[in-house]
């Protein structure tokens, strides 16, 4: 069995699970009447399917696992206790349902789906109250907590992509000018410590990486800096439009004057690399980013940040029970992303060691970048 742990006590887990559902429900309440399916998109899920998938995942891991499963039997294919929803595994198992098919699967109505979600969450909280001293239960409850909050962030990305009016507006930092940070050649521990509580399998475990001397921006590239690059021939982000002598950007359902000192977001890795190249610099590797993040002058932009690395396993990688979280994406086509989370990332995932990943052409995440260079 992999090293699985959660340091959250049962009552804290129950409160956090309830808070995550409240975040999801606040977005669900704001969907337009015809928005529960929406048009097909290769990077989005239909909301009705996605809500049900979140519930299915929680029920699968926290309520339906049978004791005595063989050690080499996959938890995603092993016999399970029955779901409270008919045909749940056929409808909502993302490991088995191709992305495009999620718009075609017959799904329960939104009211029935949300009622199932309430029933499952109440059962999970009751199980925590009875057996919260079980470390495996606490681990899987925390796994489901992070999974739900990740899907909440995916819904915010959908809100931006579709131009919907959100239930709240972002509070993004105004990034002041700052001198780049310089580091000499040294070794950095990349990854998470074994005694730090819940981590995902792709963060395991801390291991030394040698770095040559480098320089890295103290904070992400701003809209103003990117606009100057565009004025010299660079490609503007897709959600910008010319407005007089300047630019506007689309934030959800409205166009606003370009916030000059906010981090530039919704750029692909190719756009980030082109900006860095024009400046005579490059994107940082993940180890440089992680080392620099401990510096007192290192500023986060409340956005994800592209790195130069491909998403790849650490030495000795072993998949955790939810094997499809990382393993399928070690395919050479996904880029490693850092940033300690965006403005809609749950605070429990906002840690420098957290590894996110996207294919390099993606612009829909709340993602920006900073630049670096070798010394």
Where do the language-model regions lie?
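Cytochrome P450 C-terminal beta-domain/meander region
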Residues: 292-300
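Extracytoplasmic and endomembrane cell-envelope/extracellular-matrix remodeling and assembly machinery
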Residues: 174-183, 187-189
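N-terminal regions that are enriched for targeting/export leaders
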Residues: 2-36
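Active-site microenvironments of metalloenzymes and redox enzymes
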Residues: 64-105, 109-132, 215-292, 375
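Bulky hydrophobic/aromatic "packing anchor" residues in well-ordered structure
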Residues: 188-190, 216, 264, 337-338, ...
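Surface-exposed recognition segments
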Residues: 204-207, 233-236, 299-375
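Short acidic N-proximal helix/loop "leader" segments that mark the beginning
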Residues: 185-206, 233, 243-251
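Short, contiguous alpha-helical
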Residues: 14, 22, 34-94, 129-174, ...
